[in-house]
Amino acid sequence: MFMLRVSRRGLATATSVPRLKTFKIYRWNPDKPTEKPHLQEYKVDLEDCGPMVLDALLKIKNEQDATLTFRRSCREGICGSCAMNIGGANTLACLCKIDQDESKTTKIYPLPHMFIVKDLVPDLTGFYQQYKSIQPYLQRTDYPADGKEVLQSIDDRKKLDGLYECILCACCSTSCPSYWWNQEEYLGPAVLMQAYRWLIDSRDQATKARRTMLQNSMSLYRCHTIMNCTRTCPKGLNPGRSIAEIKKQLAFD
């Protein structure tokens, strides 16, 4: 019986019709400065590939072109490494399902309006420097005398829901036109949402300094409520609302 099942499975695999899906992927190699950026076409058999775009990218890299370069790590939407522009939208390749229509070509680009290291790898140095600039850590002038942790109420803890889940993938910031044109000074949706996360943390005692840092014409107020950030967030968060809440706080300063 076991041999019969194995033979039937093997026959089904051998006779299955390939379902070839076309992917056009952005390619650029800094080691070849005379070669312009271009889209390179690959075909992947959907019958022999996982359901996510990252599965297709790994299959291409492992079986067709080892030079294809992209970031990836957890494959579970936790690390944010595989953020890229897929089919015109910023998202995570590990969470983006492959369009099963073989007649449609899927185009994959790096996150838009960023310097590119190679292929699908954006340079996030500036993005991380902006994140560092908001001092994203607990700041206090005094601590409990007994040396224990600083506690907060259940209600205060709930205020952080929808904020701390950000994985800093930069999908939202790189979908924002204001960030495209002003990223040297405008902090962008992702960083501002984290700024708000620390502004409303009941345990933090640097609220005044944090507000002062944001009270200028560029760091915060380049947001024009386009809301691309909220639409594209792969974690379902709402950076636009966080920015609006910061503006409300600063209006009373």
Swiss-Prot record:
Record note on cofactor: Binds 1 [2Fe-2S] cluster. Binds 1 [3Fe-4S] cluster.
Main location: mitochondrion
Keyword vocabulary terms for this entry: 2Fe-2S, 3Fe-4S, 4Fe-4S, Electron transport, Iron, Iron-sulfur, Membrane, Metal-binding, Mitochondrion, Mitochondrion inner membrane, Oxidoreductase, Transit peptide, Transport, Tricarboxylic acid cycle
Gene Ontology BP terms: respiratory electron transport chain; tricarboxylic acid cycle
Cofactors named for this entry: [2Fe-2S] cluster; [3Fe-4S] cluster; [4Fe-4S] cluster
Binding site for [3Fe-4S] cluster: C176, C223, C229
Protein name: Succinate dehydrogenase [ubiquinone] iron-sulfur subunit, mitochondrial
Organism expressing this protein natively: Candida glabrata (strain ATCC 2001 / BCRC 20586 / JCM 3761 / NBRC 0622 / NRRL Y-65 / CBS 138)
Lineage: Eukaryota, Fungi, Dikarya, Ascomycota, Saccharomycotina
